[in-house]
Amino acid sequence: MLNLSLDEVKAYAADYTAVPVAKECFADMVTPLGFLATVKNSSSDYFLLESLENDENWSRYSFIGFDPVLKLRCKDYEAEAVSGSAAVKFTTVDPLEKIKEILAEYKVPAIKNLPLFTGGFVGYFGYDFYQYCEPAIKFDKAKATDFADFDLMLFDKLIAFDKLKQKIYIIVNVKTDNVEVNYARAEREINAIEAMLNQPVKPKPFTRANLGKIKSNQSREFYNNSIARCREYIKKGDAFQIVYSQRFTAEYDSDL
């Protein structure tokens, strides 16, 4: 049984563009990592979101999502939005506005007994994203990596593992533009995910991974000289804080 009836979702439709509906299950036999192994067999785009509180304690929820409704990435002002088999490429100097525009389609209410995160963008913003916030900053493209400036996936459904109550919430956001059709679709998706949760997980055989030699993008001499320059800038008052970094890379022959 879902947490909200069709009539309750319709009541939200006047003020919200989407409503998260959910089914509650017991989590006594399923773990986030175990379910992730099942997800990997059916989807190539997925995430597991964990977090710590006070740097030492696991937070209450673990989130898993798969099959995003949209993928959005950008590098050097050239962006691409992919939804299903359709892809659109465009140039942008302000990708944050595009992200806000997309999220405006998902104005959702906070639903009692559900976590605050019930869907949205998941991904990363790289260091080079700063150039969109400060146009005066120019990065050396010759030293750039192959990573995108940002790479995001938009999820309208996810699975939340509640460690406190030992429960699982299967959450699907119902768009309110065609609420009856979308509510029925959400029911089907929730039932399908519940069936996935009930699938037995076969443990993978243990394999030892090999980590190659760790390399820096700077020599020790260059790094030390750069730190000395940073200290001089601070002494002269040109800067009050500088976070200097170097990039480390290594070959890895397994699946992270």
Model feature map: region roles:
Residues 1-256:
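Extended alpha-helical targeting/anchoring segments
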